[in-house]
Amino acid sequence: IAGMSWESSAHYYRLLNEGIRDRLGGFHSAKCLMYSVDFAEVETLQRENRWVEAAEMMVDAARRLERGGADCIILCTNTMHKLADSIERSVRIPFLHIADPTAERIITEGLDTIALLGTRFTMEEDFYRGRLEDKYDLKVLIPEKAERDLIHHVIYDELCLGQIREASRD
């Protein structure tokens, strides 16, 4: 399931194919099915705390991919992993949770304390941070509220719209 904004989806698709090309060489590219949603609909559901409807949307996407012949489901967005359990229960093929390879890389790098940046949902709720802490015994730090609000704003009002402002990098 693609990133929620097409901006992130395009980036992930490029990285996936560059990785395949680098590994296999030549003209190789990823064999993949991608289901993209209308982020305006997703953002409305998130903002209005309509997570049951958001789960239905993600479950529908996962089932469509499964029917299309996908071998597994990857959800290319941190925030929507709030709905990971619903997605995983809805399909027979494996669902690969984004926090697992993230944690494995963190551990490989010899780290045990990390800072988590993301949307307000990702930073403040337990669905992502809790998995890192409980399953991988990592200490996860999040910014203070004012910083979380700023990061959330930058993600939604800039990055999801394809804007990368120099001032926001600081």
Locate each region found by the language model.
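Non-catalytic structural scaffold of enzyme domains
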Residues: 1-170
